[in-house]
C-alpha cells in the first residue's frame, strides 16, 4: 500500500553509484537496484534534497547518463532547502565541530537535516569512512547530533549473483 511504504532518504553517493554502475562489495549495488525497483512499484519511496541534483550533475558521470538521472528523479521526492533545514544543518555541523577533530561537510549536514526533519525511515549512504577532514555518515547511525536517525547501506530483499567480476573488492 503506497501510504505505508517506507521512505528512504538517499545520499548523493547512491545516485552516483547507480549512474556509474560502480563495482562495490557484494550485495551493495543489489540494494540500490532493489530500492529503485521497489520505488517503481510504489513499495518504497526515495527522498533526497534538491542539492542532490547539483551534486550529481557536477560529478563525472558517463555520457548520456544525465538524461537517465533526470528520468529517475521524476520518481524521487526532492525536498527544498528551507530555513528549518538550514538551521538544523548549521546546528549539526556545530555539534561535530565542537570536538575539534573531523567535522561534517555542509552538503552532508544538509542531507542529514533534511532526513531528520522529514522523519524518514532510513538514511541510505555508502559514506562510511569520510575523509581526513570529514566524518563518515554510517558511524553516526542512531544519534546524529542528538537526533534519532537510522543510517545504513541500502539492503536488498533479493540478492543477485554478480558474474561480471570474479573477485569483488573489499572495504
Model-derived regions, located:
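Short, hinge-like loop/turn segments at secondary-structure boundaries
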Residues: 63-66, 96-98, 140-143
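Short active-site oxyanion
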Residues: 41-46, 75-77, 119-122
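Short catalytic/ligand-binding loop motif for oxyanion handling, primarily in non-cytosolic enzymes
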Residues: 17-18, 55-57, 131-135
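Active-site-proximal loop/turn and secondary-structure-junction residues that shape catalytic pockets
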Residues: 52
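Acidic, PIN/NYN-like endoribonuclease modules and their adjacent C-terminal/linker elements
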Residues: 1-7, 30, 34, 117-171
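Short, well-structured N-terminal submotif of metal-dependent ribonuclease cores
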Residues: 1-48, 58-70, 160-171
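General small-molecule cofactor/ligand-binding pocket signal
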Residues: 47, 79-80, 150-152
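Active-site neighborhoods of divalent-metal-dependent phosphate/nucleic-acid chemistry enzymes
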Residues: 2-3, 78-135
Amino acid at each position: 500500500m503506497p501510504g505505508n511504504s517506507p521512505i528512504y532518504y538517499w545520499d548523493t553517493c547512491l545516485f552516483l553509484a547507480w549512474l556509474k554502475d560502480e563495482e562495490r562489495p557484494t550485495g551493495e549495488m543489489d540494494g540500490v537496484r532493489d530500492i529503485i525497483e521497489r520505488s517503481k512499484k510504489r513499495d518504497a519511496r526515495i527522498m533526497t534534497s534538491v542539492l542532490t541534483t547539483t551534486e550529481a550533475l557536477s560529478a563525472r558521470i558517463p555520457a548520456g547518463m544525465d538524461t537517465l538521472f533526470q528520468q529517475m528523479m521524476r520518481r524521487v521526492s526532492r525536498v527544498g532547502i528551507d530555513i528549518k533545514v538550514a538551521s538544523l544543518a548549521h546546528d549539526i555541523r556545530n555539534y561535530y565541530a565542537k570536538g575539534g577533530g573531523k567535522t561534517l561537510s555542509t552538503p552532508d549536514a544538509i542531507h542529514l537535516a533534511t532526513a531528520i526533519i522529514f522523519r524518514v525511515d532510513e538514511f541510505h549512504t555508502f559514506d562510511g569512512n569520510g575523509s581526513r577532514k570529514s566524518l563518515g555518515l554510517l558511524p553516526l547511525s542512531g544519534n546524529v547530533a542528538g537526533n534519532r536517525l537510522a543510517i545504513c547501506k541500502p539492503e536488498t530483499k533479493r540478492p543477485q549473483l554478480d558474474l561480471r567480476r570474479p573477485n569483488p573488492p573489499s572495504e
